[in-house]
């Protein structure tokens, strides 16, 4: 989507993670590999905050893409659809090796006028490492340009 500066999924953020979520059947999938700068205390594990970021972004991108699908439109078509996270519950199950490819899976479990809920799973090394329930709401275009005081 144009003009997306999100640190996790924004293509327009030169310092971001550039996470890209795509549909594979009835779920979304994203693949990403960490770098040493994203380490936890031990340098061989991914930081928990980074894990939360990729789960959050994958969940919200899934919700946005699902909204476009429900309207029969391509992602990014005007008028653009944007969502913002309202709640997220993360369960850290196992450490994530810093050099392992992370595979994210997203499944929409609820979508209505009050928002969208996505269940996300983070796998690495063939094992489930974390999971999250991400709730987001559709926001007006003015949300992207608002000044918060």
What does each model-identified segment do?
Residues 59-103:
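Hydrophobic beta-strand-centered segment that forms part of the acyl-chain substrate-binding groove
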Residues 1, 94-149:
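HotDog/MaoC-like acyl-thioester-processing domains
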Residues 15-18, 29, 85-89, 103-105, ...:
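Conserved beta-strand residues within beta-sheet cores
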Residues 11, 20-22, 45, 80-82, ...:
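Generic marker of residues within folded, mature protein domains
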Residues 26-28, 49, 82-88, 100, ...:
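A generic structural signal for short beta-strands and their flanking turns/coil linkers
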Residues 1-42:
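Non-catalytic linker/capping segments at the edges of enzyme domains
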Residues 32-34, 92, 138:
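Hydrophobic residues in beta-strands and at strand termini
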Residues 29-66:
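A conserved, well-ordered hydrophobic junction motif at loop->secondary-structure transitions
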């Amino acid at each position: 989507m144009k003009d997306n500066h999100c640190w996790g999924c924004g293509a327009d953020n030169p310092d971001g993670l550039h996470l890209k979520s795509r549909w594979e059947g009835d779920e979304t999938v994203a693949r990403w590999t960490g770098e040493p700068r994203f380490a936890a205390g031990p340098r061989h594990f991914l930081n928990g905050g980074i894990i939360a970021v990729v789960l959050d972004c994958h969940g919200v991108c899934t919700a946005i893409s699902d909204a476009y699908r429900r309207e029969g439109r391509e992602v990014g078509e005007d008028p653009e659809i944007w969502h913002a996270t309202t709640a997220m519950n993360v369960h850290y199950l196992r450490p994530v090796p810093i050099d392992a490819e992370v595979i994210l899976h997203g499944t929409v479990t609820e979508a209505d006028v009050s928002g969208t809920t996505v269940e996300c799973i983070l796998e690495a090394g063939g094992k489930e490492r974390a999971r999250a329930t991400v709730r987001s709401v559709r926001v007006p275009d003015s949300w992207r340009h608002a000044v918060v005081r």
